[in-house]
Amino acid sequence: MNQELSTNPFNPVAPVKTFDEIKISLASPERILSWSYGEIKKPETINYRTFKPERDGLFCARIFGPIKDYECLCGKYKRMKYRGVVCEKCGVEVTLQKVRRERMGHIELAAPVAHIWFLKSLPSRIGLMLDMTLRDLERILYFENYVVIEPGLTDLTYGQLMTEEEFLDAQDQYGADAFTANIGAEAIREMLSAIDLEQTAETLREELKEATGELKPKKIIKRLKIVESFLESGNRPEWMILTVLPVIPPELRPLVPLDGGRFATSDLNDLYRRVINRNNRLKRLIELRAPDIIVRNEKRMLQEAVDALFDNGRRGRVITGTNKRPLKSLSDMLKGKQGRFRQNLLGKRVDFSGRSVIVTGPELKLHQCGLPKKMALELFKPFIYSRLEAKGLSSTVKQAKKLVEKERPEVWDILDEVIREHPVLLNRAPTLHRLGIQAFEPILIEGKAIQLHPLVCSAFNADFDGDQMAVHVPLSLEAQLEARVLMMSTNNVLSPANGAPIIVPSQDMVLGLYYTTMERRGMKGEGMAFSSVEEVEHALAAGEVHLHATITARIKQIDDEGNEVVKRYQTTPGRLRLGNLLPLNAKAPFELVNRLLRKKDVQNVIDTVYRYCGQKESVIFCDQIMGMGFREAFKAGISFGKDDMLIPDTKWPIVNEVRDQVKEFEQQYMDGLITQGEKYNKVVDAWSKCSDKVAGEMMAEISAVRYDDAGAEKEPNSVYMMSHSGARGSPAQMKQLGGMRGLMAKPNGEIIETPIISNFKEGLTVLEYFNSTHGARKGLADTALKTANSGYLTRRLVDVAQDCIVRSHDCGTENAITASAAVNDGEVVSPLSERVLGRVAAEDILVPGTDEVVVARGELIDERRADLIDQANVALVRIRSPLTCEAEEGVCAMCYGRDLARGTLVNIGEAVGIIAAQSIGEPGTQLTMRTFHIGGIAQGGQQSFLEASQEGRIEFRNPNLLENANGEQIVMGRNMQLAIIDEAGQERATHKLTYGAKVHVKDGQSVKRGTRLFEWDPYTLPIIAEKGGVARFVDLVSGISVREDTDEATGMTQKIVSDWRSTPKGGDLKPEIIIMDPDTGNPMRNEAGNPISYPMSVEAILSVEDGQTVRAGDVVARIPREGARTKDITGGLPRVAELFEARRPKDHAIIAENDGYVRFGKDYKNKRRITIEPVDETLNSVEYMVPKGKHIPVQEGDFVQKGDYIMDGNPAPHDILRIMGVEALANYMIDEVQEVYRLQGVKINDKHIEVIVRQMLQKYEILDSGETTLLKGEHVDKAELDETNEKAIQHGMRPAHAEPILLGITKASLQTRSFISAASFQETTRVLTEASVQGKRDKLVGLKENVIVGRLIPAGTGGATSRVKKIAHDRDQTVIDARRAEAESAAALAAPTDEVIDLGPEDSGLVETVESRKE
């Protein structure tokens, strides 16, 4: 940690200091003067003839130091021997020129000036301190109004504003000395310096206790916060007003002579000049006793000049330079992408680097790259020079330089020596995850392009269509070591996002391997038997046996005991060849490759080899199968011709059939049986099914096996092989080429009803082409926009997670989360074993129904244990998670589990936050770039039924069914579930039944897989009559709350509930349908005894007439759902962003806060009141307000459970956290984020999302401050909260009560403990203003802060080094203490007893060895 500040800028002579933290606070005028080396009195910069700086000007050499090293300005003293002499003629100290980068000056202001940051940055700090509004403050500061500072005995009040006339009148009325009023910054300064902070804090606390209402306490708390922060930090309020202005060193605002006698200067010099000019003029005016109005105007101008210097454009007009361009002020230097933080401190340029185009290098090994000789020569120059000198081939650097420039033969030999085993880093922009920079050993090549190994392309996301890559040379030994051990491409086989191999063959290689492992009937040599692989190779070479023939052969294998055995297999020569490359291992048997290998299978093979045979073997294996894949693809000669796209003969019959269907729907619509919306949905559905059907026919045709005359199997269709192997192309693209193009989407995302029936092979008609251009254009536009959005999301994620590092091995927490298989629409999308892989078990995992332990508590679940869990049919597993980790800073290794990129338990010092951010952000860009591949084809079609995904017995939970007139079972309950139970009594699947669904099975019935369980209408929500009777309309008045929609096309009318609140008469209506008893004429009552009534929501379609007889189970009304929109990652990226930003959705769901019964209370103007009466008497009932006209799915008297939705919609994550706790929130977030990525087929491990959610949950909101210093509504860290509460409990005071809150990633980043990190993220000025008022200390624990101050990051090797240094330092300290104790005891023995001689400070030489040892 103890890093050295090379020279202390404020005092270069002082010894080098080490620091552990950085504090930011307000500078007092005395502090500014102590930094300064002199006052700047003139606005001049340099003399235009001599180019020497003017004395007392902005570049004065007397104040800031000499212009040339060790030479005074007039040239009287030169060279080192006069170091430190001050020249008596020109007053310049003889020293290094670089002090001009460090020495500051100052300007004595003739009138105080307010610091604009503390005035205008919201909330205004000066305003809060004085309890004045910003508008009033500006009036005083810019000399419009007077303010009363000391009212005396008059009836004016403190802080009252007066205009000039009022002020003069008051002076006449009360006399000039009766009260004090003032104007300008002086007045504000007087008021600020008069504040007694402790007294104010006391008063505010008292007021807070008595304050009631909503706004008053908030306001008091705000003021109290700022007063407390001034007290704690030791700042004084009046320091927010400047009396002395610091001037930054001249080298930091340089003036550079251009050719032609002109100068380029930093804008700051202009801004400083304006300040000095106005300040000098003001001084002169005051001396001359100028009229008040003139002086006041000059003061106002001075204030404006200083404002512009600090933050140009924050107030008033922007000050522009000569070319109408706004001048860059001090704030602009820090802000934004081009500011100091992001441009220079976080984004430095690198020396020893070069870039060039990349080409493929298939003959390279995985750890190599081809480096052009020209580049290598340039990059390794210093190494070559030193080697040339060492060999005696040159005596000076100059000579060596000449040799290299001439490119003599010996230079090349030396270059070879230098480069041997010296890794270089290759990087491809955009570097979206850590695999975008990898280390390789360079191989010198002719030519000018870098050669890249084909297998690492997917990690870099590189292709060879003109991509460029950058090369960097690690110079120091440590850097070379890290490059080799951590970043070598061979050490990065697995992806950190999901733990799957990322070094995977693609395209040609996959095609070659697919072709190699094909098996065809009736080929030459079928049925032959071979004794060894060599024999097979011989037969292949001789042409006696075909690559794809079925043969029998023996091959060496390892059995489970580890002995070599020879086994016989029925296989093909191609597979045998591949099997011969497999490392010999019991876990990698020949069966692994004895099948048709598609891309996924190849990935599995590599994964298996990596897991069981070690890294070295797997890397060699990868290289070999790459070579084999390329070779075989080339030999196979698989090509692509237009005739390979087959159009099925059945296409037109299918299309015509659907055309007739669509005509029928049109007719139904004309007859008024269905609405426009329903017709649209049905048509779109029919066409999307038709398009799928045609595609299916095409695939069947193209994949059909054909035989030649001899009965031998023909080679499959080459396009089919490309797509089926996973090399290139997808069924969706083949469908467009050979099936029908399908439905298209409009630019706004709606699906056009008429599909494109032609495919590309047949050609499109003009209209079809026009329709298809929408999709294409939308795709391109989307791509451009999304790249930016995705990059910004990654940046926010990195910022929120950057200080999440593995800091300890085990935090010892008892908390955990429950993992279960992810199920989507009753289909298991990721099994339990996949979700718990690489996690640590929090409890013993038992075989269900027994006491047999599968995985013990605290064990890491690896592949083997995960398989055991699967075999045991465990349904739920408690696992440790970063969310519940209780480590002080960062997380612990046990809670995090396996490091996905290494396959072992994570190391201490791993920056898991950054890895999580990259893993989530990287696919964002990938996905966004992949929107347009399918060309905007709509994947329409809504699911409307559910089939059993497994065999088992049906079990209903909370059943509530009603049989309608047709004998169908209709679901009437809100929380009914249907579960499928297997023989062992384990629950295999549960489905939530929506209200109004038809159930096709009975309770306890056994079902086979594929049985239809229930169906529902995907387009409308029905409202169903519970009992039979007569329907009676209430408040459904035509023209007010009901509109009759007459369809022009059909002439049929429909009654639709319209928004009655918008009509003048409709304010108090409550439109509903009541079911009446036809005999008595009273409303029918349900089981709870309430009258059966159905409130209508806006846009509901009425299905019954007033007075019509209805039967139980009939539909009374239908509420339309949203139309089918296309699912595109467009929904995806913004969705992920809004989840991580924790935004409340527009119409968010209302979640029940506790178990209870629903009651409808008295209505407001346009809201309905729903109350939940809790079952538990101790709890209070909770009220919700719902806008009238919204559909409420619960009835009076319904029982709801905690967490049920009272109103449909997307839930707000804050509500989930508040009501159901952290684990429910985590599950919600993980499921929602994974949903988006899964749609794109991207796998991301859950733990990355958990790490980000953990960072969002770091703060607690104080609900009740108790007797602590914490304030209600304040956000504090858990550590801070615990500390404060412990103190309070020790002193017998009431502790504060708080609850965890969820912050969006932007908010969480801005509220981190480190102000340096927050300032470099966003809103720089606001963050720095706040931090300086509070006197914040940055402990430098995160990554960003350390990079900014120029240290190694406290993660990885940097963390290890600092840890070692700390241990060494502690040991030194103990040694020193021991020596000191020894010396003291010896001294005590030697000293005479009666009078102890005080040797004074001279004797301290023995003890103080600290200085000499401290590094």
From Swiss-Prot:
GO terms for molecular function: DNA binding; DNA-directed RNA polymerase activity; magnesium ion binding; zinc ion binding. InterPro entries: DNA-dir_RpoC_beta_prime, DNA-dir_RpoC_beta_prime_bact, RNA_pol_asu, RNA_pol_N, RNA_pol_Rpb1_1, RNA_pol_Rpb1_3, RNA_pol_Rpb1_3_sf, RNA_pol_Rpb1_4. Its cofactor is Mg(2+); Zn(2+). Gene3D superfamilies: 1.10.132.30, 1.10.150.390, 1.10.1790.20, 1.10.40.90, 2.40.40.20, 2.40.50.100, RNA polymerase II, clamp domain, RNA polymerase Rpb1, domain 3. Zn(2+) 2 binds at residues 811, 885, 892, 895. Transmembrane segments: none annotated. It catalyses: RNA(n) + a ribonucleoside 5'-triphosphate = RNA(n+1) + diphosphate. GO terms for cellular component: DNA-directed RNA polymerase complex. The keyword Zinc applies. One of its GO terms (biological process) is DNA-templated transcription. Mg(2+) binds at residues 463, 465, 467. The keyword Metal-binding applies. Zn(2+) 1 binds at residues 72, 74, 87, 90. It is an enzyme of class 2 (transferase). Keywords: DNA-directed RNA polymerase, Magnesium, Metal-binding, Nucleotidyltransferase, Transcription, Transferase, Zinc. It holds the Pfam family RNA_pol_Rpb1_1. Its EC number is 2.7.7.6. Binds 1 Mg(2+) ion per subunit. Binds 2 Zn(2+) ions per subunit. The RNAP catalytic core consists of 2 alpha, 1 beta, 1 beta' and 1 omega subunit. When a sigma factor is associated with the core the holoenzyme is formed, which can initiate transcription. Belongs to the RNA polymerase beta' chain family. DNA-dependent RNA polymerase catalyzes the transcription of DNA into RNA using the four ribonucleoside triphosphates as substrates. PANTHER family: DNA-DIRECTED RNA POLYMERASE (PTHR19376), DNA-DIRECTED RNA POLYMERASE SUBUNIT BETA (PTHR19376:SF54). This is DNA-directed RNA polymerase subunit beta'. It comes from Cereibacter sphaeroides (strain ATCC 17025 / ATH 2.4.3).
